[in-house]
Amino acid sequence: MANQKIRIRLRAYDHELIDQSAQKIVEAAKRTDVKVSGPIPLPTEKEVITILRAVHKYKDSREQFEQRTHKRLIDIINPNAKTLEALKKLNLPAGVDIEIKL
């Protein structure tokens, strides 16, 4: 796998959870003696939802909720077979979405 890289994109609602997961991935990759770039923080997406507090009237009384999606990017440069095995064996929390591109 010469001159290749693995790009790992993490997404989660909890920034502490995503940072812990990124740290686990980086440590597992560094144990196999490969070069790791990241974790690179990507822009946080903020989704704001506005709803009426009352059902039938009082349109001026509204409530807003927001949901933030935190993202991180990790590049593993020139991975070997040990790196792939180490990444497969990682036990990461359920609240983190992982997208891997070879």
From Swiss-Prot:
SUPFAM superfamilies: Ribosomal protein S10. It comes from the Bacteria. InterPro entries: Ribosomal_uS10, Ribosomal_uS10_CS, Ribosomal_uS10_dom, Ribosomal_uS10_dom_sf. It comes from Finegoldia magna (strain ATCC 29328 / DSM 20472 / WAL 2508). Keywords: Ribonucleoprotein, Ribosomal protein. GO terms for biological process: translation. The lineage of its organism: Bacteria, Bacillati, Bacillota, Tissierellia, Tissierellales. Belongs to the universal ribosomal protein uS10 family. This is Small ribosomal subunit protein uS10. The keyword Transport does not apply. One of its GO terms (molecular function) is structural constituent of ribosome.
